């Protein structure tokens, strides 16, 4: 059987009898189904321990179909991290766009950045895994940098618009964004690791006070 024929056969594969979800019909939907399953497996086991077989079983598809879309495990890991974090970036931008004032936009970003609930915690577990995997895998490192820059870029845009509107005073929005994103990373990591005495409310208070000090604005009560 030729490689082309084998790939076509894999793409037509139906849901496995042991699969936990029903495969979607279009190629793009099949790809998303696999990525969603990979995200779940990677959150539970870590990217190093996750196997393609585990992902195929979780997605309810054949092993061959996973390889049809993602030839190597490294391809799958990088694509999963880009997909999961990309959804978060899109959600962030939509929520921020719905706010009017600069401080409301900033507070929306801070609340979305700090884990709250199972879904947000899972996203951070995957993000921390990406930090670790990026030390060894250049592709994952580039994906991580790309998505980190997207978050930081949104923050810079918020600060710039606030300065233009006269809400903020900030001589260097890029530097302020670096300070705030670094603080978010460190504090959110402590929350994900369930460090004693660290709460989401306390982290948000620290972030709001720091942001207000950096931007010459009184933090919300």
Residue ranges and their predicted role:
Residues 105, 118-142:
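Amphipathic alpha-helical segments used for helix-helix packing
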Residues 33, 41-75, 79:
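Helix-turn-helix
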Residues 1-29, 219-221:
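N-terminal intrinsically disordered/low-complexity leader segments
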Residues 44-48, 99, 120, 165:
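Short coil/turn segments at alpha/beta junctions that flank glycine-rich nucleotide-binding fingerprints
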Residues 139-145, 149, 163-211, 218-221:
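Hydrophobic/aromatic-rich alpha-helical bundle segments in the mid-to-C-terminal region
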Residues 30-38, 55, 80-84, 88, ...:
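Generic hydrophobic, amphipathic alpha-helix propensity
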Residues 37-38, 59, 162, 177:
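Small-residue (primarily alanine) positions within well-ordered alpha-helices
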Residues 79, 90-123, 176-180, 204:
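Hydrophobic alpha-helical connector segments
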């Amino acid at each position: 059987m030729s490689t082309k024929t084998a790939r076509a056969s894999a793409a037509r594969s139906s849901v496995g009898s042991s699969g936990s979800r029903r495969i979607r019909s279009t190629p793009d939907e099949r790809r998303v189904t696999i990525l969603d399953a990979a995200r779940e497996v990677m959150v539970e086991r870590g990217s190093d321990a996750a196997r393609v077989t585990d992902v195929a079983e979780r997605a309810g598809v054949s092993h061959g179909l996973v390889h049809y879309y993602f030839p190597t495990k490294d391809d799958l890991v990088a694509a999963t991290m880009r997909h999961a974090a990309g959804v978060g970036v899109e959600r962030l931008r939509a929520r921020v766009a719905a706010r009017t004032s600069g401080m409301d936009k900033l507070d929306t970003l801070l609340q979305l950045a700090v884990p709250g609930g199972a879904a947000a915690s899972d996203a951070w577990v995957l993000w921390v895994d990406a930090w670790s995997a990026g030390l060894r895998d250049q592709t994952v490192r580039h994906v991580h940098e790309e998505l980190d820059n997207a978050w930081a870029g949104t923050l810079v845009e918020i600060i710039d618009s606030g300065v233009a509107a006269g809400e903020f005073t900030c001589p260097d929005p890029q530097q302020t964004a670096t300070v705030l994103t670094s603080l978010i990373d460190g504090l959110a990591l402590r929350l994900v690791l369930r460090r004693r005495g660290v709460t989401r409310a306390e982290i948000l208070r620290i972030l709001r006070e720091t942001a207000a000090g950096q931007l010459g604005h009184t933090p919300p009560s």
